[in-house]
Structure formats: C-alpha cells, structure tokens
Amino acid sequence: MPNKFIFLLILLVCMLAGAFYFSFEQSPSSNQEGAELGIAQGAKEVDVEDEINDILVPDFSNYKNVVKKKKAFFKYLLPEIRRQNDLLRAERKLVLAMAEQTSQGNDFTGAEQGLLDELRIKYRVGEELSSKDAVAELIKRVDIIPPELILVQAANESGWGTSRFAQKGYNFFGLWCFKKDCGFVPRRRNTGTVHEVAKFRDLSHAVKTYLHNLNRHYAYAPLRDIRYQQRQANQAVTAKALVQGLKSYSERGTEYIDELLSMMRVNKKHMGL
C-alpha cells in the first residue's frame, strides 16, 4: 500500500475516533412537524448531547453600526468554518484514494474496509452498495461547503447572531432536535409537536453539525448533485450554484433561495474572503 495512502488512513483513524462524539441520528418523530412546516422531513433535524457548557457568544446587538456588526459576525464565524472545511478536505482525500484503489481493481485490506464501513455509517451510505459504489457515493457526500454560503445562512437563520438560540446555544443555523431538553422549546411551537431548537456545546460543534447535515441528509441530495457536477467539470464549488439545492431548508422554498442570493450580493464585500 502506498505511503501516502497509509498516511491518509492514519489521519482518518484519528478523525473517526472523534466522529461519534457528535451524534447526528435522525429521529423518526420529525415526520409530523416536517409536514406541518412544509419542509422536507427532518431536513433541519439533528441530535445533540444533553450536557451544555457555559456559553460565550459576542453580543452582536451592541453594534450600532450595521457594517461593523456584519464584519464582526463574519469574523467570528469564518475561522471555524475554514477549520471544518479543512477537515472535510482531509477526509475527502482518503475517499479519493479509496476510489483510486477500486478503479484499479484492488481489494481493500481489513483496516481499509473497516474505515469504509465507518464512513458508510457516518454519511448514511447504504450497506447494500458494493464497496466501489459506496466510495462513489461518498465522493458526492464528503466535500466542502463554500464559506460564503455558510455565512449568509448563519446570518439569515440567526438574525446576524442576535437570536437567543445563537446567543445561548450556538445555534446559528436553525437546526432542530427531538430529544427532551436537547435544546430550546420554541415559544410558538404547535400543540402536539415535540421539536426543540438545538443547543450546541460550542461553535465548533454547531458548524460541524450543520455541515454534516448538508452532506448526508436526503433533503440536500440536490445540493450534493450540483457540487458533484461542478467537480466533474473541473469547476470551483460555488455558493451561488449550491444555494439552489437548499429549497428544503425552509418552508419558504424559492423565496428563501432568492433571499440568500441577495444577501450574498450585498454582503460579500464584508466577509473577508
């Protein structure tokens, strides 16, 4: 086995060792609520852990100058966004190395097969697929999300970081959970529904969960297909293209997409990209 592949395997072992420290399983109880809100079932649903540490998020409402507030908001989020995308790039390198193995007709070692099995679970790739087909599907799922898209979604979903969900629980992305006391009970929750707005331990946990949700939930297969098509055409992965795959993120559908595109145009100069 090439030295490069050995290095990538070791790297992924380290990454996967912590992968299940974050729990992202979809709850079946999301079905009713997803239908009521007009979004894909469970599209914004994640599991989070009950124990929440002391929270320290900048109070963005203190900014009187709108431009300064926007710049501060982006500056706060961007380093963690870049860090999580770097982790995805490293994981993707291993998947691409696996794809090269399968294209050459080489069998995986026991260790390599074990890592593939872990990735199947992490990214919800079906056991019925052959190793070659599973790797092909992972190539679609293990990839970055452009920072520009993450930043405008965070701004849109959290009111530029001023919502109580962002301030008290690092939830900048409007993600839900369904375990009792896993988050905040919405003030306007419909009778008979049980969802809560998720709390996260820290910004890293929140961004990681958001990215994981986009990369494996069936509702965002259109986003992953757009991204894959750009990769196949040797094009840059762009926020403007991928945003078209987010119609299931909000009950507002196309109107939500148009709003995000408008936010990109107006705010790109403030992002520091």
Describe the predicted segments one by one.
Residues 2-152, 156-273:
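Catalytic cores of secreted/periplasmic lytic hydrolases that degrade extracellular macromolecules
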